[in-house]
Amino acid sequence: MNFDTSSIILGILSLFFVVTFLQSGIDKVINRTGNLAWFQSVFGTTFLKPIITPLFYWITLQELFVSGWMLIAAYCYLLCECSCCVFTDWGFILSLALLVQLFTGQRIAKDYVGASGIIPYIITALIAQFLYSNCCCS
């Protein structure tokens, strides 16, 4: 097993995004009606109103996909002999892309407090990508 510090940190950061996106994605699946109603109440007065339902499903699909992708990355770092896992690289990039979409949506809805709550996740993903780049790409 690979227990060097950088692998452990990258594995834990991968698990962080598994938990973050899996919980959110599962919640959207289990409580679809309530979450969709919330999306409609938040974005109903914006230019996104005609496409709220497809956007809701798109975000849900991305959250579930990224959480699965990051689970593979965590496995690579914590349970395999992988010292450099391409799943981690793309996982952090996909996480950042999803977080930027969520941030943009909050800004469009003029929920500035909600948008500011996403910033720590974006910073965490940026730090994780930086660590990955320095550990595996140098």
Model regions: which residues?
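Solvent-exposed, well-ordered loop and adjacent helix/strand elements within mature globular domains
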Residues: T20-Q62
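Extended, low-polarity transmembrane helix blocks
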Residues: M1-D27, Y57-S138
